[in-house]
């Protein structure tokens, strides 16, 4: 019986884990392309620099904590501790929902500050130099309270406003795309986590078979690491 269970476990590993790794490699390529595009676009034309929403820090803490709880679930399953598996998976699912909620609150803050998915430079609210700055071809612009000027034009003789007319706030668009695509993939992770939660409540994970839980945990850790990368990238690139 033990040998048969081991064979089933190994068979599931062979069938499911390669699919998971293919999905994760594809995501690495996708986000690598998006962040590369971010860097290239930032150095060209107008670019708005602003602080990330405070709720994104909350998102980071929640998803890191969820990685801890899903690891606890896997450890509990290896020991056939059904009760701990249920609690740990449930906590992970709740923390995942909290992450989504905090992201939504972060987007709400962006909208309140005039940073829209498709918006112009004139939509931005706040004090220039404190809440945001604008760069042109990599150079931060000067602002005299009325018009914008290139940094070398310290006597404010040649305003650059005509070039700014009709320009989009590309930086906020990139922010929505990066976080939105991550949320979309995390949504898939939450659906998988829901299936795992149902199985955990039915006490299906134990020392002999926890493949589904392990695969979900690996994918969840990946999403965690991906978000931390995006958060640090966005925080320091700004």
Locations of regions flagged by a protein language model:
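...captures the hydrophobic TM-helix bundle architecture rather than a specific catalytic motif
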Residues: 1-238
């Amino acid at each position: 019986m033990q040998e048969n269970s081991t064979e089933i476990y190994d068979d599931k590993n062979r069938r499911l884990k390669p699919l998971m790794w293919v999905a994760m490699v594809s995501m690495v390529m996708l986000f690598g392309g998006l962040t590369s595009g971010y860097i290239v676009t930032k150095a060209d034309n107008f670019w708005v620099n602003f602080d990330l929403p405070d709720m994104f820090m909350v998102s980071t803490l929640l998803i890191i904590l969820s990685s801890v709880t899903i690891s606890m679930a896997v450890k509990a399953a290896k020991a056939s501790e059904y009760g701990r598996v249920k609690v740990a998976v449930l906590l992970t699912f709740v923390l995942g929902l909290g992450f989504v909620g905090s992201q939504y609150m972060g987007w709400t803050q962006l909208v309140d500050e005039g940073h829209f998915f498709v918006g112009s430079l004139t939509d931005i609210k706040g004090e220039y130099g404190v809440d945001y700055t604008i760069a042109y071809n990599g150079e931060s612009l000067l602002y005299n309270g009325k018009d914008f000027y290139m940094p070398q034009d310290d006597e404010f003789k040649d305003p650059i406003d005509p070039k700014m007319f009709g320009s989009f706030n590309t930086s906020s668009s990139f922010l929505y795309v990066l976080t939105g695509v991550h949320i979309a993939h995390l949504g898939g992770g939450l659906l998988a986590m829901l299936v795992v939660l149902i199985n955990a409540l039915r006490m299906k994970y134990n020392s002999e078979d926890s493949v589904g839980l392990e695969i979900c945990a690996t994918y969840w850790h990946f999403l965690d690491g991906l978000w931390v990368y995006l958060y640090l990238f966005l925080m320091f690139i700004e």
